[in-house]
Amino acid sequence: MLGMEKYFINEDWSPLKVFINRPDGFRVIEEISYKPATEWKGSIQGKYAVYLLRKRGIDHFTVISEISKILHSKIHYIGIKDTNAITEQIVYTTNVKNIIEKYENDKFLLTFLGYSNSKFNHTGNIFEIEIETDDIKEFEKRVNKLRSIKYLPAYIGYQRFGTKRPITHIIGKMLVLREWQNAIDFLVGYPFESESELVKKARYAYMKGDLKEALELFPKRFRDERIAIKLLLRNENYFNILRNLQTPLIFYIEAYQSYLFNKYLSRIMDPTKIDENLVIKIPTSYDSCDSICREIFREEGLLNINFKIKELKLNVKDLVRKAYTLIRNLTIKDKKITFALDRGIYATIVIREIARTDPRLFT
């Protein structure tokens, strides 16, 4: 699923029933120079005004857009955090005059920390996850096994593809193939069982061609779906609709690259030959591929395709990523598993390896 074709630890583990109470049972703390962002101390002056953002159950782009309006400035960040979690991270702005000491609503808390003259060394993230399982002793045994191995394949986790609706990579593929209508159809249509009944009805209405009903049904937080439908009602073409979406289109293309990376990693990973410096490259064209990459590109129908979409002014870069990741400070106590991972590594790959079950149950 999502390119993750097999498990890493060579044990005949049966699936465990694992549940994580989202968002409250899943906490992510950004790590700055190997210390929690919550411990970062600012200076009394500097060219950046620095804030601690604590959010709960809200997606990254929505909260950044809201903060930008509150602070009347472009917001900079060093990592995109999980939507379905309680997360704490650094955000900063060059607007050092109009400081808001604290802002809070039901979704996020913004607290001014001070100033900085330099940007931040984002070393990773700390995860604190409360586990509910039918066999905690077996879960703890597997955690201890993982602690002895120390490494896991650096799969790109489920959040990158969408938690309730893991489809961002498919939209990305449609963009790469220049199939504009299909990209919009996958964005707005094709409901998943994990979605609410209201949203499923909205997507079904779109697929039936009832655009007005779909627009009425989609909640306001589904910004891009609503934008697409409104423009279709004005007879706008699909290419121009894509250009008007709020989510950056490169987000979808990078999700597709992530899917290809996972497929590649599944085919080369070996627990007996862990090379912590091994790097995998997913280039933007078939001609730049190695033999394994070419095999995957052929399977995906990408022989004469370039990921750099000039029509949309998207200068996509090669995806270069380490094959393996070190799991730091792994502990489990009172059904809470805690560990730190390097930047860009997803906690769900750790739980997936231990539980051997459908990650959508805990993503």
Swiss-Prot record:
Entry superkingdom: Archaea
Function: Could be responsible for synthesis of pseudouridine from uracil-13 in transfer RNAs.
Catalytic activity: uridine(13) in tRNA = pseudouridine(13) in tRNA
Gene Ontology biological process terms in this record: tRNA pseudouridine synthesis
Active-site residues, as the UniProt record annotates them: D82 (nucleophile)
Descriptive protein name: Probable tRNA pseudouridine synthase D
One term of GO molecular function: tRNA pseudouridine(13) synthase activity
One Pfam family per UniProt: TruD
Record keywords: Isomerase, tRNA processing
Species, as recorded: Sulfurisphaera tokodaii (strain DSM 16993 / JCM 10545 / NBRC 100140 / 7)
Keyword tRNA processing: yes
